[in-house]
Each structure stands twice: as C-alpha cells, then as structure tokens.
Amino acid sequence: MKCTSIFFSLLVIATFVVAQPNYDFTKLKREHLGRGVIAIRENPSTVVVSWRYLSSDPMDESFDIYRDGKKVNKHPLKNATFFQDSYQGTEPALYTVKAIKGKTESNYQLPADAPTGYLNIPLVRPEGGTTPSGQAYTYAPNDASIGDVDGDGEYEIILKWDPSNAHDNAHDGYTGPVIFDCYKLNGQQLWRINMGRNVRAGAHYTQFMVFDLDGDGRAEVVMKTGDGTVDGTGKVIGDANADYRNERGRILTGPEYLTIFNGLTGEAMQTIDYVPERGNLMDWGDGRANRSDRYLACIAYLDGVHPSVVMCRGYYTRTVLAAYDWDGKNLKNRWVFDSNNPGCRAYAGQGNHNLRVGDVDGDGCDEIVYGQCCLLYTSPRPR
C-alpha cells in the first residue's frame, strides 16, 4: 500500500509539471482562411449552421446568425460555432454569420429542398492500364488532404488516386502509377499530377504535404517524385523514358527527387535530390526496399514562426528526417537527423507507422515525436 501511495503521489506531481504548448500566435504564420459557414438540413424542421472559429478571433468573440437578413438567435453566441435554426421552409435560404467584435461576416446559400447533409463533389476517375506483367488495373480514391490553393479563404481538396494493384512494401509486384487531383468544393478540377512508373503505389510510399509554406496565402504541395513524374501543366520531371522497376516490380535503384508544386496549377516549381537518399539498402534493415521505402512526413513550426516541411524515411532500423523551408523561390534544407550519425545510434528503430508534431517543452517551437523518440526543433540534436 505504501509503495502504491508513493507511486500515485509521484504520478500526480508529474502530471502537474508537464510542459504545455506555448505558441505565440501573434507571430505564427498561418493560413488566411475564411469563416467557412455551412448550413445543413438536419430534419424537416431544423437547419444546422456551423462555422469556423479563426485563430485571429478574440478569445471572447461572439456571433449573430441571420437567415435571409433576419436575425434568428436571441442572444449573441459565445464559445460556440454551432447553431440549430428552426426552419421548415423548402425555398433557398441565405445564412449569414456575423462576428460581433471582429465586424466580419460570411454567407452560405442553403439550396431549395436540400436533400443531403453533405457536399456532393464529382470526381474524374483516371483511366486504368496494364502492367508489364499483363495485369490490368483500375483506380479508386484513396487518401486526401486540404489546403487553400487559390487564396480565396476556402479549402480545396487534393486527392490521391491509387491503382487497384497497389502493394504493401512487403509484397512484390508491379503497380500502376499514383495520380493526384486537385478539386474545388464545387467539383472543378484544377489539375492532375501523374507520379509515373518510378514511384511505386502503396500506403507507405507517397506522403504528400499540403500547406502554405511561404506565407503568400496559397498552399503548396510537396512530395517525393521520380523520373517520369508529370506535373499539373504536363511537364515531365527528369528522364521521361527511365524505368527502374525490376522483374519483381520493385524500385531499388535510380534517382529520387523532392518536388514542390504550385497548389493552384500543379506546376513543379522546384525539384531537388531527395534526402534522406536510398543509399545502402541494408542500412535500413533489408535488401529489398521493404524497410528503406517506409516514408513519413509532416509540417512543423520549428522556429515557432514559419512552417517547415519534414520528410522522413525509415523506422525499423535506420531513421532519417530532413527539414526544409520554402521562401517562394527555393527549397532550403534546415537540418538532417540521421540515426547512423555518431551519438544518434540509440534512436534507430524507435519509429512506427506515424509521427506527431507539437510543442512538447513549452518553448513555442514544435518538436517531432517519432515513435519512441522525440526530436528537438534544432535537430540533429535528439531529445
């Protein structure tokens, strides 16, 4: 009992001394988003109105809701971004959310007889194909991300199409190319990027980051590419004729690139050599790219002000993370952490299938929690 009491006391003390995030939001470079008002018919007599609380809003901000110019809430709505309006009408209705202190407003047009509680966005499915082994494949929507690529304050969707023959790293086999589309919420397709034959399809291979990295109000797209990747304007990256796939459909040789794309047009703005590079396959734990081709990525405020993109490779044995900044013209490497470096060997094999970003020590700068290890924002110094 005594040991239990001491342990509980230490646990309570530890709970209270844990550092809290301490971001300076007056300096943090953020997205320039609108209010994001949406109105959804919940049932025949109720419409749900929801909106975005902006990081620039005062902490005590409150809101008024209007339907076709008529105020529908009795009192200002505080500490809330959700409202249920009693409305049985079947005709179109214009909902407006007004911030009382911020003096801003945003609108949403509820369609007549709105039949669904979601936006129906039509997709343009890519045509399938056939691999060198004669296997036919088709395409299905896979992962997606969001970002305001045109600066209108509204998110667009960046959608990854995976071929039906996508493989886990542990499996042999050819795959069709990975394809990315960008759609506006009204269904307009802005561009299509084809990753080409030298980027294998599978859950671990292509980690795509979507964020406004240079603060111009428009999100960029960053991901690993290869010879034959075709950007959103039709331009080919590297050697269009190169084919590094072996007889098992694996890619064990050939150059690897990191490309930053214009989020609005899909144009490749800069392509550099990918770090961490493949190097000696056995350093990662095997010789068939099962472990060397395990990728992760994230966006982190490493200096507490500007967003950086961090590209990661490996977690079963060797682990490498490389941080980059984009100033609108150049991708600049901020740092590289490599568990193969002297003094860092204990950090090999500590990762898993995901990572987390956050200010874990309360200094206002993001750290990266990589499985069982934590990397300081000024890496290559580990925590």
Task: Please place each PLM-identified region on the residue numbering.
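Pro/Thr/Ser/Gly-rich low-complexity, intrinsically disordered linker/stalk tracts
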Residues: 22-53
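Recognizes extended acidic, P/S/T-rich segments that occur
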Residues: 53, 57-91
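Aromatic (tryptophan-biased) beta-strands that constitute blades/sheets of beta-rich domains
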Residues: 72-75, 107-145, 153-163, 169-170, ...
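Beta-strand-rich modules
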Residues: 90-101
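Beta-propeller blade termini
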Residues: 142-149, 206-214, 296-302, 353-360
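Acidic/hydrophobic-patterned starts of short beta strands in beta-sheet-rich repeat architectures
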Residues: 151-161, 215-224, 304-312, 364-369
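Short, conserved, GDST-rich strand-edge loop motifs in beta-rich repeat architectures
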Residues: 160-176, 224-252
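Conserved small/polar residues in nucleotide/adenosyl-binding loops
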Residues: 377-383
